[in-house]
Amino acid sequence: MNPSEMQRKGPPQRWCLQVYPTAPKRQRPSRTGHDDDGGFVEKKRGKCGEKQERSDCYCVCVERSRHRRLHFVLY
């Protein structure tokens, strides 16, 4: 591969995955949904239309940037 081809491709893509357990949420009388294991799942849309889910153990956020890249953030 010659240097001009390397310049067109740009830097290699990096993936960063971070997982954090969340604090238990207050008990609510009505539940918006259940995951496969029977846990509580709350779905909502963020500012840019990304999908956010909060379960008993983890929050999962799928973000879309303006550069059409998909970022998965588990927190």
From Swiss-Prot:
Superkingdom of the source species: Eukaryota
One of the record's GO cellular component terms: nucleus
Coiled-coil region: none
Ranges of biased composition (kind: Basic and acidic residues): 32-43
Positions of the UniProt region annotated as Disordered: 22-43
Keyword Nucleus among UniProt keywords: yes
Nucleus in keyword set: yes
Keywords annotated in UniProt: ERV, Nucleus, Transposable element
Localization terms from the record: Nucleus
General function of this protein: May possess a function in tumorigenesis.
Miscellaneous field: Protein expressed at very low level. Has a type 1 genome. The HERV-K(HML-2) family contains type 1 and type 2 genomes depending on the absence or presence of 292 nucleotides at the 5'-end of the env gene. Np9 proteins are translated from a doubly spliced transcript expressed exclusively by HERV-K(HML-2) type 1 proviral genomes. Np9 proteins share 14 N-terminal amino acids with HERV-K(HML-2) type 2 envelope proteins. The rest of the protein is encoded by a small exon located at the 3' end of the envelope gene. This exon shares the same splice acceptor site and therefore overlaps HERV-K(HML-2) type 2 Rec protein second exon.
Protein name: Endogenous retrovirus group K member 5 Np9 protein
Species for this entry: Homo sapiens (Human)
